[in-house]
C-alpha cells in the first residue's frame, strides 16, 4: 500500500512510475504493463470492475454482471500483458456505516490477484489501510487480504530544517521557469513550511497561483506569494504566512510543533 495525506505526493509518484513503464504498440496488439484507476466516492465493486475494464479499453465497461465483468477483465489483462494494477483513492471503498462494501471490495481484489497472479498497489489516504484491518475478523488467515499487502509505505512530509526540505524547495526553484525569490533561504523555508506543512501539493498550488499573477518576466516576489496563498485551500485555516513578520512565522511554527 502507498498511503499519505492529501498533497503528500502520492499522485505525482504514481504518475512518474507509470511514465517509466508506458504502453507499447505492437503489430497485433497493445501492451499495457500498468493498469491504473482512481476511485470516485461511494464506489461499488461493480464500479471498480468497470473502471478496470475501461482502463483496459473495453468498449462497454459497465455492461454485464459482476461475473461477466470479471471474466472479461481476466481476458483483457492477459492480452494486454498487464504486470501491475494500481488502484488510487482506495479509501473510497470504506463505507460510513457498514463493513459489507469493504469486505466485497477486498474479496474482489483478492480474487483477481489469486487468479491473474498480477500484483496490486493500493494507494490513498492513511485511513485507507482499513480495507486490510476491517476485513480480518471472521476470515481464515489464508483468505485475509492483509496477508497479500504486508508492506506499506507511508509518505510523510520532510521536517522543517532537514536537508530533504531544503532540497525540495531548491528543486521548485530550478523548475519554476521564471525569476523567483530565493525559495531555499532560511526565511522562505519557514514561510513555506507554515503555509504547506511540508506537503508537496500545497507548495505547488501556491507557486502555480503566484506564477499566474506574473507576466512571465516579473520576478515572483512576496506579494505574489501572499496573493497566491489567499486563494489557496489553507487560506481559511491559518493567517497568511507571506504577510506575517518573520518572528510571527517562527512563533506560529513553534506553536504547531507543540500541539
Language-model segments: residues:
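The feature captures the helix immediately C-terminal to the Walker
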Residues: 15-19, 204
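The catalytic "switch" region of P-loop NTPases
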Residues: 92, 105-183, 187
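Mid-core helix/loop region of P-loop NTP-binding domains shared across ATPases and GTPases
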Residues: 44-51, 59-119, 164, 184-187, ...
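C-terminal alpha-helical "lid" subdomain
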Residues: 143, 160-166, 171-259
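A short hydrophobic beta-strand->loop->alpha-helix junction that borders the nucleotide-binding pocket
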Residues: 32-43
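Switch/connector loops and helix/strand junctions flanking conserved nucleotide-binding motifs
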Residues: 10-11, 44-45, 128-133
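Post-Walker A helix-loop "phosphate-sensing" segment adjacent to the P-loop in P-loop NTPases
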Residues: 19-30, 57-59
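Walker A/P-loop nucleotide-binding motif
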Residues: 1-15
